[in-house]
């Protein structure tokens, strides 16, 4: 009721997610390597504009061959699957993040990324 869901690859559903909870998760688990509100890269590539972008395509970022060659286009479903276990989803990725096992946490993080990454970057 009231929560929109998307189908998952396993036939389940992706919870809609909570932007504020996602913001907290981003600050705790992602912000040390990624930004969403600018085009700069850190240890990881910017996530600004990530929805709809193909993996390994941020100009100036040194991706692993695995990430460049995966050819996935990031959307709610692909991010949901990737964030569960990045090294399983893209074997050979340089990303050291172990993943988020809880579906609700992944959905919250994705909601935050959807909202923030769609905004015009600061620089």
Swiss-Prot record:
Q: Which family does it belong to?
A: Belongs to the cytochrome c family.
Location(s) in or outside the cell? Mitochondrion intermembrane space
Residues that hold heme c according to the record: 30, 33-34, 95
* Ranges for region Disordered: 1-21
Q: What is the recorded name of this protein?
A: Probable cytochrome c 2.2
Q: What role does it play? A: Electron carrier protein. The oxidized form of the cytochrome c heme group can accept an electron from the heme group of the cytochrome c1 subunit of cytochrome reductase. Cytochrome c then transfers this electron to the cytochrome oxidase complex, the final protein carrier in the mitochondrial electron-transport chain.
PANTHER family in UniProt = CYTOCHROME C
Where does this protein come from, organism-wise?
Caenorhabditis elegans
């Amino acid at each position: 009721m009231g929560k929109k869901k998307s189908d998952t690859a396993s036939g389940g559903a992706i919870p809609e997610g909570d932007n504020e909870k996602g913001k907290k998760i981003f600050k705790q688990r992602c912000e040390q390597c990624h930004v969403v509100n600018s085009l700069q890269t850190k240890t990881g590539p910017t996530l600004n504009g990530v929805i709809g972008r193909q993996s390994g395509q941020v100009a100036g970022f040194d991706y692993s061959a695995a990430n460049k060659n995966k050819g996935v286009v990031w959307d709610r479903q692909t991010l949901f699957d990737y964030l569960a276990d990045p090294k399983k989803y893209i074997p050979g990725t340089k990303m050291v993040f172990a993943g988020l096992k809880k579906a609700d946490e992944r959905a919250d993080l994705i909601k935050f990324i959807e909202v923030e990454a769609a905004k015009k970057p600061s620089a």
